[in-house]
């Protein structure tokens, strides 16, 4: 759980090895963001509220491939970080 002085940031990680159009990539990021927000509403509503009140910050990063993305996803799950993987 974040301390009161910490700002929360949603981190969206995309795969660099996929050749998606900008629109498709934006849509996939949107799916992930919505699913994470819904999951956070169930699992940690106070953190979600804090995130929203502080500007709902988001950043987009790249993973080189699926294996790297799976490792990041597993690490996030192990640390009890709200996460969601879009599978298309």
Residue ranges of predicted features:
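Positively charged, small/polar-rich N-terminal and surface patches that mediate targeting and assembly
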Residues: 1-88
């Amino acid at each position: 759980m974040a301390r009161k002085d910490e700002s929360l940031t949603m981190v969206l990680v995309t795969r660099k090895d996929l050749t998606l159009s900008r629109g498709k990539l934006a849509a996939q990021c949107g799916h992930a963001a919505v699913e994470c927000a819904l999951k956070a509403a169930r699992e940690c509503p106070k953190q979600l509220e804090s995130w929203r009140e502080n500007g709902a910050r988001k950043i987009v990063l790249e993973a080189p491939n699926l294996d790297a993305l799976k490792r990041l996803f597993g690490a996030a799950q192990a640390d009890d970080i709200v996460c969601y993987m879009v599978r298309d």
